[in-house]
């Protein structure tokens, strides 16, 4: 072998070894920047920063594929004691899933329409079963997919800037990402009300509703994060103590009554119907301004979505999170194969004319046989957790 060739091979070996070392350093001590997330080790914590501020940190498949393996690594890492997830840009934690991309994929039969929901729900389950304390800082807009990244974790910290909603019935979908699990477990019929109407909760009301575990003023969140990552080998109880101490410093918003407090009796009675049609009839018969407003809101939603959502929460009330996510994957694929999801996205997100033409256009035309088919097992294509 010539000296030149030997020298060339040695250079390649050294270069290869350097690449491995660089990769290791990036993962162990530095921020991983590829894709829409920043994954950082800071003190005792693994920190996930959703980093698509121009898109309000909307969750796409690339981000899911970043977060899931890193979450699993941190879960097994003896030097990582908690996980913190937050959003960049100051406006949003995460405004939802990247629905436009999913819609485009579904129209042409692209696998993304399956992969996105499947991998998103697998991530939701990983968050719900995470062995390390998981702290979601939901400062800003938190909707749909953003709720899935937060609500199943141990701790959810809202601020005065938090805006929560599950608005899926307006786009021909349903409140997924485990909505069938956490929504029916809220007080009374609050979860069903939020699911059907897409009502938006703001600030401390997100905690009062039982969605956030803590409320901390936005200006204190940076200091809170510093105190969390500076802890030495913290337990879940230690993390809770720090969060509790910060909540005690945020008095003002907690003195206000819950935004829906004066209407909770009506919500519990009017939304206790055995069908969506019964709920609509209850609202008509009540005749109050509150009832009429809800009737008007529901009349703009996809009738198919309303019926799917009603059944989803009814079934989910007695299911495990894993069973709910399996059910919701079936529902996601039914929506991908239907009409209303594409029409809803067109009307709300693309053309923005807010004039969706639903098919069927009335609740009465949505048959129980069709709803049953949406919940049917996909066999070998079912989500397995």
From Swiss-Prot:
<keyword id="KW-0378">Hydrolase</keyword>
<dbReference type="InterPro" id="IPR045004">
    <property type="entry name" value="ECH_dom"/>
</dbReference>
<feature type="binding site">
    <location>
        <position position="145"/>
    </location>
    <ligand>
        <name>substrate</name>
    </ligand>
</feature>
<keyword id="KW-0496">Mitochondrion</keyword>
<comment type="pathway">
    <text>Amino-acid degradation; L-valine degradation.</text>
</comment>
<dbReference type="GO" id="GO:0003860">
    <property type="term" value="F:3-hydroxyisobutyryl-CoA hydrolase activity"/>
</dbReference>
<dbReference type="InterPro" id="IPR032259">
    <property type="entry name" value="HIBYL-CoA-H"/>
</dbReference>
<dbReference type="GO" id="GO:0005739">
    <property type="term" value="C:mitochondrion"/>
</dbReference>
<keyword id="KW-0101">Branched-chain amino acid catabolism</keyword>
<feature type="binding site">
    <location>
        <position position="120"/>
    </location>
    <ligand>
        <name>substrate</name>
    </ligand>
</feature>
<keyword id="KW-0809">Transit peptide</keyword>
<dbReference type="GO" id="GO:0006574">
    <property type="term" value="P:valine catabolic process"/>
</dbReference>
<dbReference type="Pfam" id="PF16113">
    <property type="entry name" value="ECH_2"/>
</dbReference>
<comment type="similarity">
    <text>Belongs to the enoyl-CoA hydratase/isomerase family.</text>
</comment>
<dbReference type="InterPro" id="IPR029045">
    <property type="entry name" value="ClpP/crotonase-like_dom_sf"/>
</dbReference>
<feature type="binding site">
    <location>
        <position position="176"/>
    </location>
    <ligand>
        <name>substrate</name>
    </ligand>
</feature>
<comment type="function">
    <text>Hydrolyzes 3-hydroxyisobutyryl-CoA (HIBYL-CoA), a saline catabolite. Has high activity toward isobutyryl-CoA. Could be an isobutyryl-CoA dehydrogenase that functions in valine catabolism. Also hydrolyzes 3-hydroxypropanoyl-CoA.</text>
</comment>
<feature type="binding site">
    <location>
        <position position="168"/>
    </location>
    <ligand>
        <name>substrate</name>
    </ligand>
</feature>
<protein>
    <recommendedName>
        <fullName>3-hydroxyisobutyryl-CoA hydrolase, mitochondrial</fullName>
        <ecNumber>3.1.2.4</ecNumber>
    </recommendedName>
</protein>
